[in-house]
């Protein structure tokens, strides 16, 4: 039995076009209030992005659901997340697949996310402090890659780490950003533009 706040959010997401019931179920199961500061707990089930410190945000539930749905995951999918952030998107993925790999540039966010995931008994996640532009070569190839910050162009390392028929979902751009879905077919990449979005930038190289 879900609360009225959760049911209200799920109904909003359905109205906005989210149809994958597995994704909606994962949204219902993950307590978003555990991934935000205490000052924002009362807003946790609103369909809005919230600050998490270090100039980063927790994405609005619609965007989390949309990007997750676009990955077309199965339980066996090998998934890479770029930008662990609060760990909320990571937790959604962890409910949908057997294992998630996640890279975070900011060490303090990585540690906070790991703690939250353990508190929720989500032990099927590997996190790494590193440059998201470089992906996670040692764990490649991946069936699905999701990027939760916007690079100005598509990182070539992430394309290289996609398995054949794998899917990459990410926001791309600086002033004007668009959500892209990229499917690999051999050495070709089929790129679809989904919708206009607004994300924090994917910072290259420098770790924090």
UniProtKB/Swiss-Prot annotation:
Predominant subcellular localization, coarse grouping: cytoplasm
Location in or out of the cell: Cytoplasm
Superkingdom in the source lineage: Bacteria
Keywords annotated in UniProt: Cytoplasm, Methyltransferase, S-adenosyl-L-methionine, Transferase
Active site: 59
Keyword Endoplasmic reticulum among UniProt keywords: no
GO biological process, one term: protein repair
Entries under InterPro entries matching the protein: PCMT (IPR000682), SAM-dependent_MTases_sf (IPR029063)
Top enzyme category: transferase
Assigned protein family: Belongs to the methyltransferase superfamily. L-isoaspartyl/D-aspartyl protein methyltransferase family.
Matching NCBIfam families: pimt, PRK00312.1
Function: Catalyzes the methyl esterification of L-isoaspartyl residues in peptides and proteins that result from spontaneous decomposition of normal L-aspartyl and L-asparaginyl residues. It plays a role in the repair and/or degradation of damaged proteins.
Record's protein name: Protein-L-isoaspartate O-methyltransferase
Taxonomic source organism: Klebsiella pneumoniae (strain 342)
Lineage: Bacteria, Pseudomonadati, Pseudomonadota, Gammaproteobacteria, Enterobacterales
């Amino acid at each position: 039995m879900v609360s009225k706040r959760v049911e209200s959010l799920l109904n909003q997401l359905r109205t906005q076009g989210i149809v994958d019931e597995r994704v909606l179920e994962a949204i219902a199961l993950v307590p978003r209030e555990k991934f935000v500061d205490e000052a924002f707990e009362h807003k946790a089930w609103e369909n809005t992005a919230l600050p998490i410190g270090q100039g980063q945000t927790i994405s609005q539930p619609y965007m989390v659901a949309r990007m997750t749905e676009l990955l077309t995951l199965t339980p066996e999918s090998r998934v890479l997340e770029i930008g662990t952030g609060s760990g909320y998107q990571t937790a959604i993925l962890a409910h949908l697949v057997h294992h998630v790999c996640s890279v975070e540039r900011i060490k303090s966010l990585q540690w906070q996310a790991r703690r939250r995931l353990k508190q929720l008994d989500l032990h099927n996640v590997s996190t790494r402090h590193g440059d998201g532009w470089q992906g996670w070569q040692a764990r490649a190839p991946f069936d699905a890659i999701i990027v939760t910050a916007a690079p100005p162009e598509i990182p070539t390392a992430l394309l290289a780490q996609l398995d054949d028929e794998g899917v990459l979902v990410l926001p791309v751009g600086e002033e004007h950003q668009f959500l892209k879905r990229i499917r690999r077919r051999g050495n070709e990449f089929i790129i679809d533009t989904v919708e206009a979005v607004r994300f924090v930038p994917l910072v290259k190289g420098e770790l924090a």
